[in-house]
């Protein structure tokens, strides 16, 4: 991929070690489908004749950094490339992990694809309000799931997204 820099974050090795130790099939699926998600972005980017600046592997999976695409329609194609992969795999495999990744990534919360799409097409103030509302609902739902004994994952994701948004303000 030419001049694309590959960055391996130490946390990527931590999550691989944890996944191997935990022997959790769902965790491996999510890691694999997250990589395929990013490959969807990469495919869309390359199809438009653009090149990523950086490919980063970290605790959160794989992330692409690229220069801003010159027009909103092509940027939309790049942003939707990842969720489209999860949607296709969800439909074809009837796999709940892909369904969850698709739905999560389409939420209008920055830095998720849905949040970036909202920022691209909606007025800034509306994007901020929409993101805050969805994040509040997601956090409340995560707290409820934890209270009912369903696990900490949703609450953890929503708190991470909340911190990401606070950092960007």
Where are these regions (language model features)?
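Hydrophobic transmembrane alpha-helices and their immediate loop junctions
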Residues: 1-169
